[in-house]
Amino acid sequence: MFNLASAPFAHNRKQTQTLMLLVILACLPGFLAQTWFFGWGTLIQTLLALVTALGCEALVLRLRGRPVKPALLDGSAALTAVLIGLSLPPLLPWWMLVIGTAFAIIIAKHLYGGLGQNLFNPAMVAYVLLLVSFPVQMTSWLPPSSIAAYDIGFGDAASVIFTGFSLDGYSMLQLKQGVDGLTMATPLDTLKTGLTQGLTASEVMTHKVFEGWGGIGWSWVNLGYLLGGLFLLQQKVINWRIPAAVLGSLLLASTLGYLATPDATATPMLHLFSGATMLGAFFIATDPVSASTTAKGRLVYGALIGLLVYLIRRFGGYPDAFAFAVLLANLCVPLIDSLTRPKVYGARRK
């Protein structure tokens, strides 16, 4: 019996449009949890990203002399927009999202030839571009609604995104405050800041934002994306090897790190159920174009992402490291595929 590996082209019986729609549908549980805990901004950002992505897709296709309607209906641009909208802070200024989304479609996707040709995950290229260019705004997350000092409705969220102030005149800095008057951040941000200030991990994690496995709200968001990821596995939209390797590698690395230096690192459960862990493992790392295509290669690729996530979270300057980890792993895909390609029957061993 011989192992066969698919070529880099898609051969799934499901049409591209169906696959893209299934992935977007699978995002729904995490999206609902994210909207529930962090407000309407997530919905507004996602809709704005959709309009921008589809507009840029149509413009570039027309300039390239390609058919516009089939490409718009295949769902690839829409999926990129959804992933961008879910990855960005809910109240990020609208023009930053437009810049990131346009860059993802025009540069990260079409500069390489369009659908199926991109070397890097377009959504993560957009995220990293914005994070490097606007680090303050990209780390300005709202506190979960249960501990927020201000109730932010749909109108307030839209007003902050498009004007910088809520309907009552509150700035983003004021809206970031929790009920205790302290400026809030994500659990991973809070931990990184506390460790930088000389506190131990156990001291930092007494903060109320760390309630639950991955922090208030974030545990449910990650459970939502985990549920969506299991749906994709059941539908055979994604291969199990990549998310299993990502989560397994991250769990192993974070467990060893926690056992070695418990006062200087997050718990394994916080690594798994905070930040973009489940979104990254099931929806971003599994991009069929930029991920490895061989069976062994997918395990290596996923394990590399999980290890890089831990190392960047532990030693790097950015608390949530999934975008950087995925892009670095994308760079390694040609080498990984070359080293893990099954031998052709009858080929002489070197």
Region spans (language model):
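A beta-strand-loop signature enriched in Asp, Gly, Thr, and Trp
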Residues: P243-A295
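Loop-to-transmembrane alpha-helix initiation sites
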Residues: L119-M124, M269-T277, R298-V300, G316-L327
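N-terminal signal-anchor module of multipass membrane proteins
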Residues: M1-R62, K343-R349
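C-terminal ends of transmembrane helices
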Residues: L4-A7, G55-P67, I105-G116, L226-V237, ...
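Alpha-helical transmembrane segments in multi-pass membrane proteins
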Residues: L22-P29, L48-E57, S76-A81, G85, ...
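Structural signature of hydrophobic alpha-helical transmembrane segments
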Residues: W40-T52, L91-G100, K208-L223, T265-T277
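A generic, well-ordered mixed alpha/beta core segment in the N-terminal half of proteins
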Residues: T80-F154
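Long hydrophobic alpha-helical segments that form multi-pass transmembrane helix bundles
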Residues: P122-L223
